[in-house]
Amino acid sequence: MKTILVTGGTGLVGSAIKKVVETTEKRDDEKWVFIGSKDCDLENLEETRELFESVKPTHVIHLAAMVGGLFHNLAHNLQFFRKNMAINDNVLALCHEFDVIKCVSCLSTCIFPDKTSYPIDETMVHLGPPHDSNFGYSYAKRMIDVLNKGYAQEHGRKYTSVVPCNVFGPHDNYNLQSGHVLPALIHKAYVAQRDGTPLQVYGSGTPLRQFIYSIDLARLFIRVVREYEDVEPIILSVNESDEVSIRDAVSAVVKAIDFTGDVEYDTSKADGQFKKTASNEKLLKLFPDFQFTPFEQAIQESVQWFVDNYETARK
C-alpha cells in the first residue's frame, strides 16, 4: 500500500490532484493525504517531523511554497527566498529520515535564466541568473534540484522535480495584489462586469505565456509519481505552439465572463519577462498519448468555478 502525502494540498494544484485521484485516477493500493498550511508549519522542523511520524508516507508530492505574482515578488524577494529555502530543506530532510521512496517537488519556469535561448529545456536550470523580479523565489526553487541531486549522490534517493509552466484553474488565489495573472484577471473582469466599470489590465498585454490547466497538471503529476524514475527535472508544459499573449488571455476571460465593457491597458505597469517559452519534448517522449484541455475550454471552466464560488474563493 502506497501512502502519498501532498504538501500544499489545499491550493490550486493540490485541489486538482485531489479531484483527479478521487475520480478518474482512483486506485485501491494508494492512500492519499492532503495537508495545507493550517495543518502544519513546514518551516518548523519539529512540526514537519510530527507530520511525517503521523502520516508515514511512502511517497511525497511537495507543492507547499510561498508564492505570488510579479508585484508581490518584486517587493519581497528576501522573504520568498528564506521561507521557501526553509520549507524545502525540511521536507526533503524528512523524506530521507523517514525513508520515503519518491518525492516529487514542484518548481516553476520562472527559475530559468533570464538571458537564455528558446525554447527552454531541463538542461538550462543553472546556466545563468534568473530574472531580477523574482530572484528570491527562483533561487530557492533551484536549490530543490541541488538537494535532489545531493540526496541521489550521497544516499541513492529517487527525489525529483517537475517544472510546470503557468498554472491556472479552480481553487486559485484570486487576490488582486498577490495573485498570478489569470486568476487576478478573472477576478478583475468579474468585478468590472458586476460594477459596470472598465477592465484595467496591468502592462502592455504583449508578453507571451504558456498556460497549463490545473486538472491537466494534476493528471501529469500523478503519472510522474507512478512512472517517472529519473532525478533530473521534467518540464510539464503545453506545446510551444499553444503559447498565448496576455492580450489573448484577456480576450478568453472577457469572452468566458461575457464582459462587454472597455478594456484598458496600463502601460505604466511592468510587463515582467517578455516570454519564457519552454520545450515539452521530454514530456511528450515519456507520455506521448497525453491530451491537454483546450485553453478556451479551461478558461471557461475556471471562470465558471470562480463565479459559482465567489463568496468562498481565496481573494
From Swiss-Prot:
Keywords: Isomerase, Multifunctional enzyme, NADP, Oxidoreductase
Gene3D superfamilies from the UniProt entry: NAD(P)-binding Rossmann-like Domain, UDP-galactose 4-epimerase, domain 1
InterPro entries: Epimerase_deHydtase, GDP_fucose/colitose_synth, NAD(P)-bd_dom_sf
Record EC number: 1.1.1.271
Membrane among keywords: no
Any Gene Ontology biological process: 'de novo' GDP-L-fucose biosynthetic process
Site feature Important for catalytic activity, where: 108, 110
Transcription regulation is among the record's keywords: no
Active site: 137 (proton donor/acceptor)
Site feature (Lowers pKa of active site Tyr) residues: 141
Enzyme class: oxidoreductase
MF GO annotations: GDP-L-fucose synthase activity; isomerase activity
Reactions catalysed according to its record: GDP-beta-L-fucose + NADP(+) = GDP-4-dehydro-alpha-D-rhamnose + NADPH + H(+)
Pfam families xrefs: Epimerase
Pathway: Nucleotide-sugar biosynthesis; GDP-L-fucose biosynthesis via de novo pathway; GDP-L-fucose from GDP-alpha-D-mannose: step 2/2
Residue sites binding substrate per the record: 188, 209, 271
Cited SUPFAM superfamilies: NAD(P)-binding Rossmann-fold domains
Family statement: Belongs to the NAD(P)-dependent epimerase/dehydratase family. Fucose synthase subfamily.
PANTHER family: GDP-L-FUCOSE SYNTHASE
Function (record text): Catalyzes the two-step NADP-dependent conversion of GDP-4-dehydro-6-deoxy-D-mannose to GDP-fucose, involving an epimerase and a reductase reaction.
UniProt name for this protein: GDP-L-fucose synthase
Biological classification of the source: Eukaryota, Metazoa, Ecdysozoa, Nematoda, Chromadorea
Gene behind the chain: ger-1
